[in-house]
């Protein structure tokens, strides 16, 4: 991955926020969680709608949370790390197997989304994210107020907008 001008500033802002959860964030090719070492990956170069379009599910479940799509995606990944201890190793393996089945099934997008979001680890990661943003709107707003200009600056400095 090429080095982007301004990404260090974004990393610093995000990690100053995620530190409260014991989570480290790093720029990556997609949004993902590595719960074993409490790390989340985030991207700024593509759509964060992710597998199963959790953003549509999240905003349907939390219509009162008016967060940017980037925040939803980031907080969802943090939510995976924060809820990881709810599951046994066998349950986590089962969830992965179920997601493999979902992704390979020949079903419509609505059915896939419903099935995907019914996976307990996905459901509770989104629940954690929505509950946190609902219960801490000032903290999340302050974070976004710092982060959004840094993201826009990075896009400009790299000729992306």
Describe each model-derived feature in a short phrase.
Residues 1-4, 82-84, 130, 135:
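N-terminal low-structure segments adjacent to metalloprotease catalytic domains
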Residues 1, 27-31, 103:
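Long, low-complexity, intrinsically disordered N-terminal extensions of eukaryotic proteins, enriched
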Residues 23-70, 78-85:
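Active-site scaffold of zinc-dependent metalloenzymes
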Residues 4-24:
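Zn2+-dependent metallopeptidase catalytic core
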Residues 1-3, 20, 63-67, 90:
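Selected N-terminal structured segments and early membrane-anchoring regions
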Residues 95-161:
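Metalloprotease/metallohydrolase-associated module, dominated by Zn2+-dependent proteases
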Residues 68-72, 76, 123-127:
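A structural signal for well-ordered alpha-helical segments within the folded catalytic domains
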Residues 41, 67-73, 81, 85-117:
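Acidic, low-complexity, intrinsically disordered interaction modules
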């Amino acid at each position: 991955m090429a080095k982007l001008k301004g990404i260090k500033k974004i990393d610093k802002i995000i990690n100053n926020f995620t530190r409260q959860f014991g989570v480290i964030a790093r720029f990556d090719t997609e949004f993902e969680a590595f719960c074993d070492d409490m790390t989340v990956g985030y991207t700024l170069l593509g759509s964060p709608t992710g597998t199963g379009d959790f953003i549509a599910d999240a905003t349907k479940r939390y219509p009162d949370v008016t967060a940017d799509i980037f925040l939803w995606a980031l907080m969802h990944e943090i939510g995976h790390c924060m809820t990881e201890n709810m599951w046994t190793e066998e349950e986590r393996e089962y969830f992965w197997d179920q997601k493999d089945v979902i992704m390979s099934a020949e079903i419509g997008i609505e059915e896939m989304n419903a099935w995907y979001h019914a996976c307990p680890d996905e459901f509770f990661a989104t629940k954690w994210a929505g509950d946190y943003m609902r219960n801490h709107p000032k903290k999340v707003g302050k974070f976004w107020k710092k982060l959004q200009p840094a993201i826009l600056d990075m896009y400009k400095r790299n000729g992306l907008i």
